[in-house]
Design a protein with these regions (language model features):
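Solvent-exposed polar/charged
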Residues: 22, 105-106, 136
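Acidic, proline/glycine-rich short linear motifs
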Residues: 34-69, 102, 151-166
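Structural beta-alpha unit
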Residues: 76-112, 152-153, 161-166
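Glycine-rich, Arg-bearing micro-motifs that act as flexible, cationic patches
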Residues: 111-133, 137, 147
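Short, flexible loop segments at boundaries between secondary-structure elements
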Residues: 140-152
Length: 166
């Protein structure tokens, strides 16, 4: 079985790797870091902040190098967690979530593992609604691991296993 783990270096994505390792120790995993091309990021920025076209290629190469290192860091964490991990780094095709879904299809992942949210702003690799969109578009099982501090958000004195609405 091959699993796909979305990784952006955030605490949420680190928690997703750790949980996948606990649950699926010894399984094969592809640790995917998705990055946004500078041209796409600039197009989303205000027109006054756009870079010269020739700078974008240089910036993309630098970003890709950093993202490859980040993917390798994620794969190292996955190996430490007991998974047989391979790093992978892809630029987003349309949106981060669609790249995750596309890669899962390409590698025939039996499961996609992601955190609940990643970094925001320019460093965003797993946007706030990315895990939700992956869940609804993947066509395969998706494991969404809550943030490490989600336990502190629990309602005190609730019965174990009880859901609470606040």
């Amino acid at each position: 079985m091959t699993i796909l783990i979305a990784y952006d270096g955030s605490d949420d994505s680190k928690a997703a790797i750790a949980f996948a390792g606990e649950l699926l120790k010894g399984e094969s995993a592809v640790v995917l870091t998705v990055w946004e091309r500078a041209a796409m990021a600039s197009a989303r920025a205000s027109v006054g902040l756009m870079m010269a076209i020739d700078q974008l290629g240089t910036e993309d190469a630098a970003i890709e190098g950093a993202m490859r290192e980040l993917a390798e860091q994620g794969a190292d964490l996955a190996r430490q967690a007991g998974l047989v991990a391979t790093p992978r780094c892809d630029p987003d095709s349309v949106a981060v979530w669609s790249t995750i879904v596309d890669v899962a299809e390409e590698i025939d992942a039996r499961l996609i593992v992601t955190g609940t949210r990643g970094f925001g702003g320019v460093r965003s690799l797993l946007l706030g609604s990315t895990s939700d969109r992956v869940l609804h578009h993947a066509g395969r099982p998706v494991l969404i691991v809550p943030a490490p501090d989600a336990a502190s958000d629990a309602v005190p004195d609730a019965e174990p296993g009880a859901d609470a609405v606040t």
